[in-house]
Amino acid sequence: MNKMLLAGSTGIVLLSAAASPVWADDNASTFSLGYAQSHTNHAGTLRGVRLANNYEMSPDWGLTTSFAWLNGSQRYSDESSNGRVTTRYYSLLAGPSWKINNQLSLYSQVGPVLLHQRDHGIDSKVGYGYSAGVAYTPVSSVAITLGYEGADFDATHNSGSLNSNGFNLGVGYRF
């Protein structure tokens, strides 16, 4: 089931990205790079980067795609052992953007997320991610983005479902 979810989500994201030719002259694109931070209920706080592209397909609507990579480690200690857990988080999301005016637009995204943990062994979990945010363009070629990103994963243990919630802040170039 997880592999089907990952394959389907990845296919949708890649087809969406391919459907938006960023080399077109008539429509604007905004590439942004920024800081991302997320907190998982089992792996602690993760920090990393987010790369995004917003392609304006019409005067009001666009397509936003993003890739996030976050990393973190956390010490643990219990009755039987102690050590450090290293966690990596990858997301590939896509969705629509709505241009409210020349300076402000909103976006939402969905797509696959991979959480990779290393302790005594390796454990990977596939889930789905979702994101929403705002992009502010104070001048014609610069954009500032602020967004929320969350993810849900299937639990492989008895302590409940694994999820993450975080934010991202980026600066982009619009052309």
Residue map of PLM features:
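Cleavable N-terminal export/targeting peptides
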Residues: M1-A28
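Short glycine/proline- and aromatic-enriched beta-strand/turn motifs that initiate or cap beta-hairpins
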Residues: S20-R75, Y90, L104, L114, ...
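Outer-envelope exported proteins of Gram-negative bacteria
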Residues: A52-N54, T64-S66, S91-G95, Y107-G111, ...
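Outer-membrane beta-barrel strand-turn architecture
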Residues: Y55-P59, W98-N102, Y136-S140, F175
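Outer-membrane beta-barrel translocator/channel fold
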Residues: S66-V85, G111-L115, G147-T156
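Helix-adjacent hinge/juxtasegments
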Residues: S81-Q103, Y107
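Outer-membrane beta-barrel "beta-signal"
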Residues: V134-P138, A143, N163-F175
